[in-house]
Structures are given as structure tokens and as C-alpha cells.
UniProtKB/Swiss-Prot annotation:
Name by which UniProt lists this protein: Guanylate kinase
Species, as recorded: Streptomyces coelicolor (strain ATCC BAA-471 / A3(2) / M145)
Domain Guanylate kinase-like span(s) in chain numbering: 17-197
Catalysed reactions, as listed in the record: GMP + ATP = GDP + ADP
Role, per record: Essential for recycling GMP and indirectly, cGMP.
Length: 197
């Protein structure tokens, strides 16, 4: 067994930064919670997903997403360059594998904000990851948030609500559930789950 410097002790496995996956239905506030947490604790590395979706107003390539064509996404998938990928509301999303593994090997806390399908893929390939489900305070509140965005046509909102029912039913598959009643409180709880504090 390797010796440790005097006055220190090895970091117990449960105290090391780890891969934390945040998932939950569309409109539950995942992006808002993550943005708040990272504003206070930028040391938590958030993976930037690749997507075939068109950018929303204010979104920047390489900051919010890597916006790619269908052909580029096909290549990423075929070459095994994605840790996980999923199709949602007619668009594909995926997490670049290399950047995540490099951060984890460096001992940095990594956070993925992904959908249910992606969370299941991560669970299969990296069972040590902590899966966190972000739940809405109520179904009515989730509907209000989705329709209040005003960025998508009604048929897309209907697809998102149908998917939300499936995602809410999968909550027991997760290691932890956080109810988004307060962005600040949920961000603090999520931070604790990344083993940063």
C-alpha cells in the first residue's frame, strides 16, 4: 500500500469528485439550476453536448451546445465519440466522450445535463456515476413552464409533455431525486452531490 504524506489521509472513494448526471423532464429547470450552481462554483465542469437542434436566441456554439449537422452527428456516433446520445423532439443530442473522461481522470467533478435515454446509457457504461432526477413541484407547474417558454410550436410542446410523463415514471431508476421548488436550494443540493463541498 502506498504511503501518504504525514498529516494527510487518502481521500475515501465516496468523497472524490465523480460523474454526476442530472436528468428530468423538459421544462423542469435543469439548465437554470446548473447555470446557478456553476455561477457560484465554476470548478464543476459541465459537459457541452452536441446537438442537431437549431440554436435558440442567445445560444452560442461551443458554449451552450456544439451545433452540428445530421451528417456530423452520424460520424460522431459511428466513431464511438459520444458517451451517450439520444433523440428528443426530432433532434439528436450527445455527450462527447473524450472531454468527460479526461476531466474525471484529472479528479475534477463532472456534471452531465442529459435526458432519460442518455442517463440510462451512462448508467450502463459507467455504473459508478450518480444519477440525479430533477422533478417539478407538480404536473401543472411543469405544463406552465413548458407553455410559458413561447419558443416552440404547440405540437412540439405536446411531444415534450408526452415525453415528460415517461420521464417522470422513470424516477425510481435514479439514485437521488431533487424537487425544483427553489433554484438556489436545488443548486446547493446538487453541488453537495458532486462531492465538491
Amino acid at each position: 500500500m502506498a504511503a501518504t504524506p504525514r498529516g494527510t489521509s487518502p481521500v475515501p472513494p465516496d468523497a472524490r469528485p465523480r460523474l454526476t448526471v442530472l436528468s428530468g423532464p423538459s421544462g423542469v429547470g435543469k439548465s437554470t439550476v446548473v447555470a446557478h450552481m456553476r455561477k457560484e462554483h465554476p470548478e464543476v465542469w459541465l459537459s457541452v453536448s452536441a446537438t442537431t437542434r437549431r440554436p435558440r436566441p442567445g445560444e452560442q456554439h461551443g458554449v451552450h451546445y456544439f451545433f452540428v449537422s445530421d451528417e456530423e452527428m452520424d460520424k460522431l456516433i459511428a466513431n464511438g465519440e459520444l458517451l451517450e446520445w439520444a433523440e428528443f423532439a426530432g433532434n439528436r443530442y450527445g455527450t462527447p466522450r473524450t472531454a468527460v473522461l479526461e476531466r474525471l481522470e484529472a479528479g475534477e467533478p463532472v456534471l452531465l445535463e442529459i435526458d432519460l435515454q442518455g442517463a440510462r446509457q451512462v448508467r450502463e457504461s459507467m455504473p459508478e456515476a450518480r444519477l440525479v432526477f430533477l422533478a417539478p413541484p407538480s404536473w401543472d407547474e411543469l405544463v406552465r413552464r413548458l407553455t410559458g417558454r413561447g419558443t416552440e410550436p404547440p405540437e412540439v410542446i405536446e411531444r415534450r409533455l408526452a415525453a415528460a410523463k415517461v420521464e417522470l415514471a422513470a424516477e425510481p431508476e435514479f439514485d437521488q431525486t431533487l424537487v425544483n421548488t427553489s433554484v438556489e436550494d436545488v443548486a446547493r443540493e446538487l453541488l453537495a452531490l458532486t462531492n465538491v463541498v
